[in-house]
């Protein structure tokens, strides 16, 4: 286990019905999701997670080399299981290991503005210089927009 991977896991707590902002990254930041088809594989996996009631997605953006995902964790699964399932499904479909180990998570506190967090997430393509308007980027969703 790499030194930073252990620090990613320290203090991690999974709580049902908690809203989380998760970020997971491709191995060596390879822009594998620049491919429309590959990006849609991630989106399909996120939707499946919702359909199985593991999560309730509030917002996401699939960037060329990472994913931001804001969701409410269901009561049947642990946070690490949900992330592992998403990563595994996409890896199997692509046919090769693509993910950096671990992920970053932030449990949203009651006093945090969830809509502003969603705006931050979906504005990622603008900040990265990929598009001028959010609507021009195809791989995002937010329940408020």
Listing of model-derived features with the role each one plays in the protein:
Residues 1-145:
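Short catalytic/metal-binding and nucleic-acid-binding patches
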């Amino acid at each position: 286990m790499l030194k930073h991977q252990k620090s990613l896991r320290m203090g991690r707590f999974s709580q049902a019905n908690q809203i989380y902002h998760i970020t997971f990254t491709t191995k060596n930041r390879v822009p594998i999701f620049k491919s429309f088809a590959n990006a849609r594989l991630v989106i399909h996996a996120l939707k499946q997670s919702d359909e199985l009631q593991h999560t309730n997605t509030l917002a996401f953006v699939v960037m060329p080399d990472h994913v931001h995902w804001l969701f409410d964790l269901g009561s049947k699964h642990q946070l690490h299981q949900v992330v592992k399932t998403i990563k595994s499904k996409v890896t199997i479909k692509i046919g090769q290991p693509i993910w950096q180990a671990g992920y970053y998570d932030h449990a949203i506190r009651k006093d945090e503005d969830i809509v502003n967090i969603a705006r931050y997430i979906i504005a990622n393509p603008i900040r990265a210089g990929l598009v001028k308007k959010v609507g021009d980027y195809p791989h995002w969703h937010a329940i408020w927009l």
